[in-house]
């Protein structure tokens, strides 16, 4: 497995080198201007992503050499290291028959072009998040995160036993891409702000980095949503290009240095109660595999989906303590009246999305029914147990 490493970040590290946190935005723009050149290079590399034996082969000689492009900075804690680990797991489970070279966002293609190059068959694998594909696949938002929606364990139950995964793959099929759940950040935080939020009026006019359905909800509240890659967030927040941002949770947010650029850290993360990461597989490349290697691809994604959720839950609680106790971050809860307004706006956004096209309507109906049913069960079980146990 080849992993590009401009710098090294161990999975146990919290801080990120200054070279990442303070990367100039114009450097990223220069990378974008090289886009045509990079895409031309993809064609020259096409021979690398080949299956050496026929699709029907089940023998030990079957070999594939694939490339994975991601939406994350190199080795970025959580997201980036998850992509590396998935590539390694594919190689190990296949006994070396699947070799994956990993390219971070911007190394081969821009971070937000991952879906496009996999769809075009130029790249075999992508590691990204459904929230970025609003323009290409409106229904994808419902697999990324739904404001005030299901938590990770509820979401996974819907995917595997409620028909969610079948709908997800049906939604992406017209683009020639097969999505698999390959990670979950867990429940996220509400974001970093350079001013206190005491009422809905305080949101009006703010420029905030917030993608997905959460961004559409915030827009209804008067916020100007901005979508920029993670590598640009720190500089944008520090220079005042944006007034606020949400990213993930304490572990990733501290790694990105966001506590150095904003004073207030808000919760709950109503906009992303469950943050899905996805492995995008070229349908053509996947169909060229033997049944055995197809099973290995699916199994590796399932394993990573579970593993990284556990990692985020473990690391986030430790990182939050460091942020508050050592860095003096001001932790704040969104006022109840603000959450109520945002919840009402969320329903409007979801209903508008469901009305856009039949696929979005089917996904939303399935999601909503399952969320209602499993929510009633979890309030009786996990919710009541958590409340009853107090502090052990």
Question: Where in this protein do the model-derived segments appear?
Answer:
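N-terminal secretory signal peptides
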Residues: 1-32, 43
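N-terminal secretory/targeting leader peptides
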Residues: 29-32, 38-155, 165, 170-392
